[in-house]
Each structure stands twice: as structure tokens, then as C-alpha cells.
Amino acid sequence: MPVVWPGGKRFAFTIFDDPDSQDEGVSRLVYALLDDLGLRTTKAVWPLGPRRRPNSPGETCASPSFRRHCQELQARGFEIAFHNATLHASLREETIEGLELFRDYFGRDPLTMANHYNEEAIYWGPAR
């Protein structure tokens, strides 16, 4: 079955931005450019702040300013996605809390996600 692209187009292009190593200042610059260019991309977030030592630098939605920034992006048509609960491995309860926070912050469950490289990710260990 052939793929039918929106608007009769022959292909589609997307960007899925994961939050590793990105701070709010950089995010604001990048998304201002994407917005100016009329591109609507996907920004993944960590809803939950760290509970243990992070294994990646980057912002989480525990920062009210960063959370507002992501909500503003969503309001402008950018998709917000889930990148697991936080920037380190999460227990089941923390993952559930992260999903609940995502719903609270963005008004729905995530439609897309990309695994972070933690123990709960599907590609963790030697198979990664």
C-alpha cells in the first residue's frame, strides 16, 4: 500500500529533538529559529526532576521556566514528546509519576517517545 503524504506531497521530513545536553537558553534559540522558518518539529522532555545523580546534562520540566517554555512551544504547534521520566534510570513508580506529570503539564498522554539510554529503555545493555 503506498504512503499518502499530507497535501499531496511526495515525502515528509521531521526532527525529533531529544533533551540530552540542551539547556533552556539553547532550546529557546533553536526553537526561535525553527519557528521563524515555519518548521514544526518534535521536542522530547523529561517531566520529572532528578532524584539521583543524572547520567546526562539537560533541563527537565521540574524547572518552572523550562516547563513554561515547552508549553509555549506546544501552543505554537510544536509536538511535545516523552523521553522517559527523567535524566537517569527510573523506578516503575517514578516512570508512572513522569507520565502523570506529562499529562498534567501538556494536557494529554504522550503520542511519541524516544527511549533514553537507561535500564528501563528497550535497548539497554549489550543489545544496544
Sequence positions of predicted segments:
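Catalytic alpha-helical scaffold of carbohydrate-active enzymes acting on polysaccharides/glycoconjugates
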Residues: 1-128
